[in-house]
Amino acid sequence: MLILVSVVLKNKLGFIFTAFSLFALGFYMASSSNLKINIKNPVFLECKVISFPEKYYKNFLSDCKVLNSNNKNLINKEVKLISNKKLFFLSNVYILGKASIKHNKIFVKVVNLKEEKNKFLSPILSFRDYLIKNFKENSLNYISFSIGNALIFGDRSYIPQNIKKAFINTGLIHLLAISGLHIGLLIFILLFIFSFWDKRKSYLITILFLIFYPVITAFHIPVFRASLMGILYLYGKFKYLAINPMNILFFVAFISALIYPEVIFSVGFQLSFIAVFGLILSRKYIEIDIKNKFLKFFITSMLLSFFAVLWTTPLIIFYFHQFSPTSIFATTFEMFLLIPYLFLSVLNMFSLFLIKPLINIMDFIGLKFIELAKLFDSLKIMASNLDLNLIEVLTYYILLGFITINSKIKIIYKYILFFILFSFLFVMSKI
């Protein structure tokens, strides 16, 4: 229905309806899909590893696309391999194991396996392992290594559960996942580091870094997506082209879905996409003209957090049934630690994590980053047992989009309407 409406409407409003139509499909599929497969053990699998290994209790967990199996129901399915061995990304593996279904996902406990490593990627991934090894050896302690492993290499599996819980309770868990925010900060940092050269050279070096960075961060789809957006944006700058961020966003979403069609059903993809989509639509409310750079940074960060929360909260309630208003102001304060941390992480990457004092300064900031999250968690500001249905979510987004793009409404009245709409969201979620 929404798709038909979007054809009739024109310009931005039709554009918004098209986006929400796609999300409606993703919401429906993500919330209603129920895996039903008859599995007989043991299973024999030939599959391709499509993720980097993550720590899973005393073993490692890897995603794998099944190419062939004695159980025909598993062919072309994605399974999670539990193994005591780290499997290389894009390796072909032959497995004997025991399969089970948990949380609507297929898990295979590996009994025996043979691995054929990808000849092209193997040396690159070995270099990634070399950097992680150097970082671990020179890090202050396990906690500082675990936070760095998440913020630099994209692996949150080493972070202790109590620390993860503090970030979840405060709505700051997105800061532990490398996403558009981190890539944006890295672009800013790299352009600053190479600002002594002319702009075109600094753009080119940053593009080369963004091409390589997804390998360092385990080819996580959010990193690939954000890096591709950054590359296209910088390439436009390099070639003096007119840049439309919305076009770049939808092009990258299309490429992501083309490479990995299931991504449209991913909650992470939906949250990331709607956040960037909302920030692009709301950017005229975020860009403020203040001469004091510190004050401008602080207010801009608060506005970014506010609009990101405004656009993502319905999805968070829809999927997780909880919300922490702490994230609106907590994100801003954490940014004051995240920026120097990422700045030092770039220097450490260039020095191959061999300069211990430089790593330890970064570790110190990382530990303060955790302490601040725990401080906000101690405030215990959390709304739980919330519930929204798909119609309510879509109605909210249509109204929010209409208020945002309507040029006839004065800005002060828009903020009042934003507040009323946001408050109404919680009234609906409690009914």
What does each of the following model-derived ranges do?
Residues 88-91, 267:
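Short, flexible surface segments
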Residues 219-418, 427-430:
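Internal transmembrane alpha-helical bundles of multi-pass membrane proteins
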Residues 18-21, 205-212, 249-253, 414-424:
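Central hydrophobic cores of alpha-helical transmembrane segments
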Residues 70-89:
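Beta-strand/loop nucleic-acid-binding surfaces
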